């Protein structure tokens, strides 16, 4: 990947042939500006560095949002597929799935799109121009997250099923949403989530508070419980929900550590 800067007529051929031609906005000639891909408005080379940093941040956030959306939806598919194959009653009803997809998936994904840049973002090698999004490492991460999410929700369903189908669905519903909160922190960083600034994304935290509030409203208010076909949980069942949800983060971080050590 080669970038070329120039401001004169004689620079036009090089600007045209470079992967990214950068012309000077103040001192550059019209010919150089026409030949370039980018015009540097302030003629400050430091702006190029900031532009590269911002471009990498946008690309990273796009990847994280896609990974989160696909992982959560595949996790739901794993849950429903296992239920069908094992001839269980449906672990989640259509209205519950609708709430999970519209509230639990979409809002956190939007918040990820405005996440801050990773600490090592400028020390990485550039992405190949012809490289697609669905690379082998990316596909592996999605599959891993989906299996983890599907596994903990299946566990919640089986535990709740010992009491009643209503309890099973309520626990599955809660674990599916709360697990996404913990999973999103693992997705934010390719390294350990402890290395990232935990409270740096205010939009993400605002989204988590909003989604958690709406979820608790649906689960605790009798009228909303009736609408969403949920039931009240005991304190022990709530602790199980919390433990399984945190288990997603623990398993995800362990898998990342294992992958880094192998690499």
Locate predicted features.
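Short, Lys/Arg-enriched, Gly/Pro-containing loop segments at transmembrane-helix junctions
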Residues: 118-125, 195-196, 258-263
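Hydrophobic alpha-helical transmembrane segments in multi-pass integral membrane proteins
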Residues: 152-156, 210-226
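Alpha-helical transmembrane segments of multi-pass membrane proteins
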Residues: 100-104, 176-183, 211-218, 245-252
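Cytoplasmic-side transmembrane-helix entry/capping segments in multi-pass membrane proteins
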Residues: 196-205
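Multi-pass alpha-helical transmembrane bundle typical of ion/small-solute transporters
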Residues: 121, 206-207, 238-241
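Loop-to-transmembrane alpha-helix initiation sites
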Residues: 94-96, 203, 233-239
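Cytosolic catalytic headpiece
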Residues: 1-12, 16-20, 62, 84-87, ...
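Membrane-embedded transport module
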Residues: 1-3, 25-191
């Amino acid at each position: 990947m080669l970038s070329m800067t120039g401001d004169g007529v004689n620079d036009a051929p090089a600007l045209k042939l470079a992967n990214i031609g950068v012309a000077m906005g103040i001192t550059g000639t019209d010919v150089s500006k026409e030949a370039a891909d980018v015009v540097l408005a302030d003629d400050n080379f430091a702006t190029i560095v900031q532009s590269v940093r911002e471009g990498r941040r946008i690309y990273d956030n796009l990847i994280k949002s896609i990974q989160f959306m696909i992982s959560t939806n595949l996790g739901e598919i794993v849950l429903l597929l296992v239920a069908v194959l094992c001839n269980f009653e449906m672990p989640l009803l259509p209205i519950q799935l609708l709430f999970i997809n519209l509230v639990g998936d979409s809002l956190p994904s939007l918040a990820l799109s405005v996440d801050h840049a990773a600490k090592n973002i400028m020390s990485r090698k550039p992405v190949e121009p012809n490289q697609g999004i669905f690379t082998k490492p990316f596909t592996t991460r999605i599959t891993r997250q989906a299996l983890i999410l599907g596994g903990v929700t299946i566990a919640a369903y089986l535990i709740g099923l010992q009491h009643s189908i209503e309890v099973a669905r309520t626990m599955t519903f809660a674990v599916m949403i709360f697990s996404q909160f913990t999973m999103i922190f693992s997705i934010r960083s390719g390294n350990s989530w402890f290395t990232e600034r935990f409270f740096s994304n205010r939009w993400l935290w605002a989204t988590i508070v909003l989604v958690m509030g709406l979820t608790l409203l649906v689960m605790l208010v009798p009228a909303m419980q009736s609408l969403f076909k949920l039931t009240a949980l005991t304190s022990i069942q709530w602790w199980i929900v919390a433990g399984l949800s945190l288990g997603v983060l623990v398993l995800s971080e362990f898998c990342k550590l294992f992958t880094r050590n192998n690499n």
